[in-house]
Amino acid sequence: MLQQPTISRFFKSSSTRKKSEQRTAKEEAELMQLLESDGENNSATVPSDRKPEAAPMHVGLGNKAAAGGAVPGQVKSATRGFEDFRFNRRREACGKEQEVGFAERLQRIMERREGGCVEEDETELDNEAPRSKRAKPNRLTELDQQFKDLKLQHMDKVLAVRVGYKYKFFAEDAVMVSRVLQIKLVPGKLTVHETDPADHKHKKFAYCTIPDTRLEVHLQRLMHHNLKVGVVEQTETSAVKKNSGTSSSVFSREVTNIFTRATYGINETFGTKDRRVLGDSASVWGLVCKRQPSYTRYFLVSVNLNSGEVIFDDFKEERFLTEALETRIKYTNPSEVVVGDGLGSEIEKVFHTSDSDITLNRIELVGLYEEIFSEPHPAFKGNVPLQTALMLVHGYLTNFKNESLLFFKENFKPFCSKTHMILPSSAIESLDIFENSTDRSSKGSLLWVLDHTRTNYGLRNLKNWIAKPLINIDQIQQRLDAVQCISTEVGNIFIESLNNMLRDGQDLERILNRIAYGKTSRREVYLFLRELTQLATLFSSHHRYIETNVLSANGKIRMQSSLLANIFTDLDEYWKQFPIPNFLAMINIDAALDKNPDRPYVEYFNLTKYDRAEPLISKQQDIEAVIGELRDELKNIRVILKRPMLNYKDEIDFLVEIRNTQVSSVPVDWVKVASTKAVSRFQTPGTAKLVAKLQYHKELLQDLALQEYESFIKRITGEYTSLRKAILHLSTYDCILSLAATSCNVDYVRPKFNTAPQCINVINGRNPIIESLDVRYMPNDVNLNREGKKIMIITGPNMGGKSSYIRQVALLVIMAQIGCYVPAQEAEFSIFDQIFTRIGAYDNLLRNDSTFKIEMTEMVQILRSSTENSLLLLDEVGRGTGTHDGISISYALLRYFIELHNACPLILFITHYASLGSIRSPILGNYHMSYIEEKRPGENWPSVVFLYKLKEGRAHNSYGLNVAKLADIQTGIINRAYKISTMLKQEMESNSSIAAICTIKHALAGNSAASLKSAIETLIESADHEQFVLNM
């Protein structure tokens, strides 16, 4: 039988008697005499049918020894015999009942272990508590009860509770976290309300733990699952608890920080150094919907805490259409949407089925708009629903103490503007603007091609530029001038130094907002001011270059780029006005860089240069005066103890240390505080009063220093508007620098713009994304304009490059209108106000949308929103339904656009319906991606070699079997498919010809000209290599 050390303590120690220890008759008689005498002295009564249980031997022996009637040898022998007798009598009395009781007790302990009530590393809990301290069966431990109390106040959050050097998650939080983090879950109660059927089997909550050093990593993993996590910290130390006299209870705890994906980056306290901060682009929405029978009106306020940007919008959309709402989701990337009333099932589906993981939060409004926002933004005046949306965001951010951002009016801006276009969500998705459609990473996207930014705030601004291309030709030319100028000046020492400083710098925009929220650390404030000071120093050290090339009317930069000249001029003036170096000089560098958060605030300031140091210095002088009194008290102590070299043990508690051999010379009114084997430490009545007085002044100094630090932060926040403007200038410069780096690629050319509408003339244009992936790309021309072709019907084999070609055209337009060079030999564009796409086939099962329904919904949006200055990319419209219906829809759409004449937008139309190529119109042209057919042994179908070159004319085959071959489908299967395809094609041609001949016969018999014309047209359409002339 295996030994169980944790259970063996329940066995009472006893030894087996040897035969040599058997009692003699004389010893039995002596023992019985002792029992009789013990029974007389025992006050307890026993039943008459059993002998009295012997009292402890030392009592009886003590009586005999006092009477002088016992000798040592007899006492020892009698004691041993008495113990043996008691053991045997008790064993006989208990018998098997004792064994059964022990077995039951052991079973209960093992059940507690299996139920999680006894932890494997807490073996002392195996011992059952005395009856006086044993808890009630269903009573929670103090820690579990504390968690329950906190959880009931924060049911919408996952609570991470600090317990020593770990963080614990309990109950339903533990179940969720253990699944996300893939860590062990210790069994226990699974719900805080104890509603789970198995909860009654356990006395403690289920839990899982993580080390405190890994909290940041695990928090980010939880944030990726869009969980709201509250961090519960201990609000008292063991020393404070000991002094408070409550050391037996649990530490007091409270929720000290709350994290969500949108608020993590602005509220985190880990000092992350990553360039890409979690939730950097995520936002919080306040949304109000007003539903009408025919449309829904939306009132939106979107807040990005990291950038400080507050976007507001008021728009309406027809019922059952959500393109405009989805577009705003793509732009602002909300992770949390705050609403007051219900949105309706259709609108909620949009959030639940979007690519972003969005959480809906319903809150009740508290207070009035006029009471909270005394100076409202002009756009909110009179718009009550929009005010309500702002109030919803304010109420939600108040929980995180981030609402101060909403009081800076310069952060507000409308979603729509007359200076830029808004790319629809379908275009952002199908053109791979921010992420590729394969693995959703940034590689393989337009952002990946253009992103050479050096700062986080520059990257955020670049995303905004890409998503909202300019539609003002003067602003586009200004950006192109700046890109060209910076490309020629990149070797200048001032430009190079500025570029390096931005690359190695902090996220100034994020830190500025953290300062405004009061969430920053002392170290972060110092680094923020230091970088701004370095920028100011850079501009002042190159003042001659700036005066000559920027400020002068004939300066090289001012002559080449008014945008760059304005940026450098504003920054130069700002650095001269704002006293950043003075602020930095007020900080003690050693204390600022110290990572110890408990370091006194007074040490953060350099009091010799701090302009408000008088109260702090005065309080320090009070402390020095008390320390002087303590030194005088030390002189008196030396005299009393006759030890002239005596000093205090330390200058914290000011204790007097004396050897234990000399304690007798200590006055009686001294208080012993601590002692060791060698020494004892005392506090005199005088030092006790002075130490209390010293502590009082130190606390006053700490409070005063904290007030001065908060005042110092407010002085920086008071410059928020000017600082934000300067940082925006730096982000604009960073974006220009990024576009300049892209424009320096080989064979990139500056695009030209003309005021004439509807023009795309590109020679040897290339797809920038595919080319950047080190794939050899065949250049192609584009020629669309008002005088020539406005519609291109593009046919050709599958995988021939049709979709890549039309995407290339859209990407070139976007790059040109954000002010970047394009990959082409020559490029000329007009200004486009919208880019619409209908590319790809996909469904949405969660919203009950089939592939064809999505196609038609997108086409409705395009037909209603497009103008003559729009660019349309239509890829295989009608593919989601039957062939005949698909052809009919495509034909009807083309005829609709052709009939618009001059109001027709520029269209690139991909199709596999060869009959559509028979349509002729002055504004329509047929093109195909060229290829070469070749015959291979063992293959009945023609193989295709792709040339990826656009040519005029239409293709008569899609060569789908060739794609099947590329996918490694067996040759026999493809041969059979080719045979069936040929038979079906011949059958369709035969049926069409017979029907047409019959129609002609009847028409000739009836002399009907209309019927004859219809029959002839049907016959001609049945021939693949004939052309159908449509009289438009």
From Swiss-Prot:
The keyword DNA damage applies. Residues 18-29 have a biased composition (Basic and acidic residues). PANTHER family: DNA MISMATCH REPAIR PROTEIN MSH3, DNA MISMATCH REPAIR PROTEIN MUTS FAMILY MEMBER. It is found in: Nucleus. Component of the post-replicative DNA mismatch repair system (MMR). Heterodimerizes with MSH2 to form MutS beta, which binds to DNA mismatches thereby initiating DNA repair. MSH3 provides substrate-binding and substrate specificity to the complex. When bound, the MutS beta heterodimer bends the DNA helix and shields approximately 20 base pairs. Acts mainly to repair insertion-deletion loops (IDLs) from 2 to 13 nucleotides in size, but can also repair base-base and single insertion-deletion mismatches that occur during replication. GO terms for biological process: meiotic mismatch repair; mismatch repair; mitotic recombination; removal of nonhomologous ends; replication fork arrest. Residues 136-262 are annotated as: Mispair-binding domain. Residues 1-59 are annotated as: Disordered. Belongs to the DNA mismatch repair MutS family. MSH3 subfamily. It comes from the Eukaryota. The keyword Nucleotide-binding applies. GO terms for cellular component: MutSbeta complex; nucleus. Heterodimer consisting of MSH2-MSH3 (MutS beta). Forms a ternary complex with MutL alpha (MLH1-PMS1). It comes from Eremothecium gossypii (strain ATCC 10895 / CBS 109.51 / FGSC 9923 / NRRL Y-1056) (Yeast). Keywords: ATP-binding, DNA damage, DNA repair, DNA-binding, Nucleotide-binding, Nucleus. Gene3D superfamilies: 1.10.1420.10, DNA repair protein MutS, domain I, MutS, connector domain, P-loop containing nucleotide triphosphate hydrolases. This is DNA mismatch repair protein MSH3. GO terms for molecular function: ATP binding; ATP-dependent DNA damage sensor activity; double-strand/single-strand DNA junction binding; double-stranded DNA binding; heteroduplex DNA loop binding; Y-form DNA binding. ATP binds at residues 796-803.
